[in-house]
Swiss-Prot record:
Natural source organism: Eremothecium gossypii (strain ATCC 10895 / CBS 109.51 / FGSC 9923 / NRRL Y-1056) (Yeast)
One GO CC term on file: mitochondrion
Annotated InterPro entries: Chalcone_isomerase (IPR016087), Chalcone_isomerase_3-sand (IPR016088), Chalcone_isomerase_sf (IPR036298)
Name recorded for this polypeptide: Altered inheritance of mitochondria protein 18, mitochondrial
Gene3D superfamilies in alphabetical order: 3.50.70.10
Amino acid sequence: MLNKRISNLATILRFIALPRARNIIAPQEYIANSVPVAITRRAARNTFVFSVALTPFVLYSAFHNDSAESDFPELVEVYPGVRPFPAVLGPPELPLQTNYKLLGHGVRAVTFLSFKVYALGIYAAVDDLPLIPRTLSAEYLSTLDTEKVDAPAKEQLYKAMQDHEKSRAVVNDLLGKGLRLVAKITPIRNTDFTHLKDGLVKSILNHPAARHEGETLANGLEELRAAFTRRGSVPKDDDLVLELQATGALQLYHRDAKTGQTTTLGKVTEPLIGRYLFSQYLSGKAPLSKDTKDSVTRKIISMV
């Protein structure tokens, strides 16, 4: 009898040691990347009951580590030839207001030849991550697709993000709730601050709502131009970091890849600038980086 109990305990501890503890209690559920977990309900239920009774602190640690760290590796390869992107950005490496977690990444390409210009990562404030599923509730999503109000939330969100207008509505509503974001722009080849500045200005002007804003947008764009307080070259692998803060302001930073030094550039206080820019990255008919938009879409779908 004692040997049998010891054997049962060993089995329990092996399950607890699994890197994704939540897989034990959620068989056949879609977890993060929608891969079904091949554990029977009965085995999972029995394991969970004994595990909670015997080792609550181990289980808590496993759940905590999974939610905080396991969704992403420490570094993510985005494009050959540029440094991998960190899964988390924040102090002290960068003077951001808080820590930000990678939502998705891709490459920005221009012209009909798909000339690749920079690698891109979109990050969300760690403290704001609960805003995403709370905003994109089943009730909210049902208002976006009145033809299939009973469809699963993930399906409704996927369809909304494939639609030009509905995807803008989703992103605008997230930003309207105060979701803080960061765009990490890493040039694939040598460039300069003027080219980066002109590219951002052009992208904002191409937002479909820009023509209706007139003087407000013009003043914001002047702020953006002035925020580029540095001149000269930006070598390949340097970073231009854009932080969309809680106030709607857009703070700019430049990180030198060779020295590791970060320079705080200027700030744009007009909220339209940051909102239009991130809307252009993540939604609409022709997002600035389709693979980044698709990558972020997959992540937020996994969160609802």
